[in-house]
Amino acid sequence: MAKVLVIKTSMMGANSISNVLNDKFMEYYKEKNPNDEFIYMNLNDEKMASITMTSHNMKEYFVAEYSDKYINQLKKVDKVVMSVPMTNFNVNAVTKNYLDHISVADKTFSYKYSKKGEAIGLLDHLSVQILTTQGAPLGWYPWGNHSEYLKGHWRFLGAKVADHILVDSVKIGENSKKTPQEIIEKFDGEIKKAAYSF
């Protein structure tokens, strides 16, 4: 039995395509793994995720309440399912703030035992499933690839990252007139396959 941390990040609530994607993935995951333990977290509800690192708060930024609490949570789970919409060509602010708070030298990565100078991720027990959405088709804006950023960041921390699911083009053409549920339905087979294998 695995412990699974399920993270939502969208500010759009019920109208969020990434939230619907997350729900659909978890529906299929639970079909295959009904006895797993699930912990749900919406970053919009976490004070930590609204705090951005600046020159004025460096001393307080990594206090236990905002950093160790979430690092320890990751150390106690086996899997992470994280859904993130694209916002202005990148991850949204709550996601960036979360990743900044959990990326701490000698807690989630370290250079101490590196032979070539590269960082060694310390969360190597984790498996991560990334679920992303974006308004434009993949490749329209080459500088904006939040899926690859998320994959790279989790791998930097040592996690094993499954092939991500990207639901793109959600604001283009006919998709702009569809409900989140209708958009996600087109990806149903891909979502089910990924959920069953994660």
Curated annotation (Swiss-Prot):
Reactions catalysed: 2 a quinone + NADH + H(+) = 2 a 1,4-benzosemiquinone + NAD(+); N,N-dimethyl-1,4-phenylenediamine + anthranilate + 2 NAD(+) = 2-(4-dimethylaminophenyl)diazenylbenzoate + 2 NADH + 2 H(+)
InterPro entries for the chain: Flavodoxin_fold, Flavoprotein-like_sf, FMN-dep_NADH:Q_OxRdtase_AzoR1, NADH:quinone_OxRdtase_FMN_depd
Keywords: Flavoprotein, FMN, NAD, Oxidoreductase
Pfam families: Flavodoxin_2
Record's cofactor remark: Binds 1 FMN per subunit.
This enzyme's EC code(s): 1.6.5.-, 1.7.1.17
Entry cofactors: FMN
GO molecular function, one term: electron transfer activity
Keyword Oxidoreductase among UniProt keywords: yes
SUPFAM superfamilies linked to this entry: Flavoproteins (SSF52218)
Binding site for FMN: 10, 16-18
Job description of the protein: Quinone reductase that provides resistance to thiol-specific stress caused by electrophilic quinones. Also exhibits azoreductase activity. Catalyzes the reductive cleavage of the azo bond in aromatic azo compounds to the corresponding amines.
Subunit structure: Homodimer.
Family: Belongs to the azoreductase type 1 family.
PANTHER family reported in the protein's UniProt record: FMN-DEPENDENT NADH-AZOREDUCTASE 1 (PTHR43741), FMN-DEPENDENT NADH:QUINONE OXIDOREDUCTASE (PTHR43741:SF4)
Listed name of the protein: FMN-dependent NADH:quinone oxidoreductase
Species assigned in the record: Mycoplasmopsis pulmonis (strain UAB CTIP) (Mycoplasma pulmonis)
Lineage, uppermost ranks: Bacteria, Bacillati, Mycoplasmatota, Mycoplasmoidales, Metamycoplasmataceae
